[in-house]
Amino acid sequence: MEKLAFLPKKKWMLRALELAREAAAAGEVPVGAVVVRGEDLLGEGRNCREAEADALCHAELLAISQACRKLHSWRLTGCELYVTLEPCPMCTGALINAHIDTVVYGAEDELSLIHISEPTRPEPI
């Protein structure tokens, strides 16, 4: 029974992986993201900073923007984001602002907000 519950999540992560492959083929950082609510795909995106010459063209931001337009609301309560790489600080801020309920990521990123904000200790002398 647990495996059946996981199938929708796998479906969405596989779509995010397809988008990441498209980004890689285009010479971009290979990240793909989808925003869903239940079984409805609301938005998707892949990194395209190089092609668009725009620092804001992160997969997560594009997926969030598309979902907001589809719902005619900036509040994405009840939505989930599936992304291939742990979100950076900018994208984490957007996820919080959009009220995304759940984030599922495929790989950790040492540049994510969690890793950047970890307390560091000076080396003993």
Question: Which residues does each predicted region cover?
Answer:
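A short, polar/charged loop-to-alpha-helix boundary motif
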Residues: 51-61
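Short beta->alpha transition motifs characteristic of CBS
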Residues: 42-49
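Short beta-strand scaffold segments in enzyme catalytic cores
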Residues: 31-37
